[in-house]
Amino acid sequence: RMLDYVFLCFFLGNDFLPHFPSLNIRTNGIHILLDAYKNIIGNKQDCFLLSKTYQTGIKIEWKQLYKLLLELSKNERNLWKQEYGLRSKWDKKPVMLHQKGTSKEKTELFQNTPVLYRKEEKYINPYQHCWEERYYQVLFSKNVCKENIISNYLEGIEWVSNYYFSGQVDWSWKYKFHYPPLLKDMIPKISTIKTTILPKRKTKPVPPLVQLAYVLPPIYHHLLPTTVDSTILDKQTGIPLHSNGLPNIEFQWAFCRYFWECHVKLPEIELY
């Protein structure tokens, strides 16, 4: 059961996958998951979300995951409404633009940006008809197919399981989006999965200095060792810059609580 508990927590978000707005760790997300697990799987003998054998290692039991997500999806819209209602309370609080405020007041205002400016969330509005379509319309690129989002997320569930439980992963894999698909939209796809879905591909982890080179703004590249290949640094040229040389970056904060949780929109950098 311990492995199942860890696996459940993947749906609350981690370093590799975003959390579901309807399953927020701040608003009883873990209890919602555990209640669904208790109702569907409980202590049934030989009934788990993950199985482990010497031959295959850790394996997702997709049939059981289907049942669990089906249970969660039945209440998905209500969970969205609850989360939306909690965040709507911030609309009643006046936004004081502390132009002459203290440094602490300005920092607090800045960090509260995601709950003070909720344009995208208000447009989605789960209380109104067709909110699901608006969710994908606002939070994903127009040319993205919903099926690709679903497949990519389900790959991610398997990838993260392999990463934490066996360490044998394709280091080139990534989840390509800032938000997950809706729970109900994953149900049809999961019902067709019988075995592993990730293609086997042998890759090496990205070297630490290369990782550092990719996250450092260009104006700080002089801090890197001279051994770092210049072609690596050249790949950052796609990031737009302000006139002062600092990166001109867009942020997306729908359903985030604090600004530091925002999703950063950056151009793709090919690693492999």
Where are these regions (language model features)?
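Long, low-complexity, charge-dense
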Residues: 1-272
